[in-house]
Amino acid sequence: MAIGLTTVSAQRGMRVKKNVPLDSIRLSDPAILADQKTKMYYMTGTGGMMWRSADLKLWEGPMRVTEFEADSWMGARPMIWAAELHQTGDGWYYYFATFTNQAVIIDTVRGNAIERRASQVLRADSPMGPYRAFGDATYLPANRPTLDGTYWKDKDGKPYMVFCGEWLQNWNGTMEKIELKPDLSGTIGEPKVLFRASDSPWSREKNDKGEITWNKVTDGPYLFRTGTGRLGMLWTSWVFDVYTQGVAYSESGTLDGPWVQEPEPITPPGYGHSMLFQRFDGQWMMSVHHHSKDDHGRTVRIPHLFEVDLSGDKLIIKL
C-alpha cells in the first residue's frame, strides 16, 4: 500500500524552507516546468524532491511529491534520478524519472553488479503531485539498466521516450528511443539505438591500456527544435574527470536521425545534464547543474540557469 504524501514527509523529518536562493540549493539534473496554470516554476531532479518559485530566484522546498507501491519492481523507496515534468495538453502532469531498486541485481559485468534501474513515468493531476505509477508495470526491458528518460513528440505525431542504455552493462553507452502509448501509460515495440557514446568527437577518457579515447558514458538527453525547425539533442558525458555537455542535430529532423555531433561541447567545463524551458516572459532558458569538488574532495552539484537563443539554426547559449 502506498504511504500518503503528508505521512512520508513527517516520517522523514523534512523541513520545507522558503526564500532559498538558487545557488544555495544542492541538486543534480535540475529540470524546471513553467506551469501556465499556476504561474509557478517547479524544479525537480535527482533525489525525488520538488522546489517551486515564482521568479526563478528564490525557492521553496524541498518537498517530496512521489508515492510508490511496495510490490512494484521499484520497491517502496527507490533511488530517484533525473526527474523531469512534462505536459501533453491532456490536463495531467507526467513525471519522467530513473528509478533504482538496489535490492535487485540483474547482471554482473566485469566484476560490477548491475542493479535494477530503469526509466518510468508517473502521473499526477497537480504539479505538486503526488505522482504515482498509473500504467504498465515496466516501460523498458528488465534485463537492462536504463536511465534519464525524457519525452518527445516526433513529426509522426507519436510520443516517444528517449533514454540512455547505461555504459555499466554495454561499455559503450547508447542513446535510444521507444514509442509510448498515446496516453503515456506504457511503451510500444522495442527500443531503437539513435547513437552511441563512441560517436562523440569531444568526450575523452583513458582506456585500460592508458590510451586516450572516447568516454563511454551517455547521460541526460533533452530534445528541442530551433527556430528554423531543426531537431537537436542536448546530452552529457565526460572529458576525463570533467562533466561536459554536447549537442547533436538530426539530419532528417526526426528522432531517427542520422545524428551529427557538434565537434565541441556547448557549455563551459563542469556543466551538464540540462533541459530547456521558457520563462513566463517568453525567454528560453537552460537549466543545468555545475559539477565540482569542494575543499574536502566531496562532489557538489549546484543548479544554474543560462539564457539561450533558439531563433536561428543552432542553439546558442548567452554566456
Where are these regions (language model features)?
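Bacterial N-terminal signal peptides
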Residues: 1-4
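Carbohydrate-active catalytic/glycan-binding domains of CAZyme proteins
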Residues: 8-319
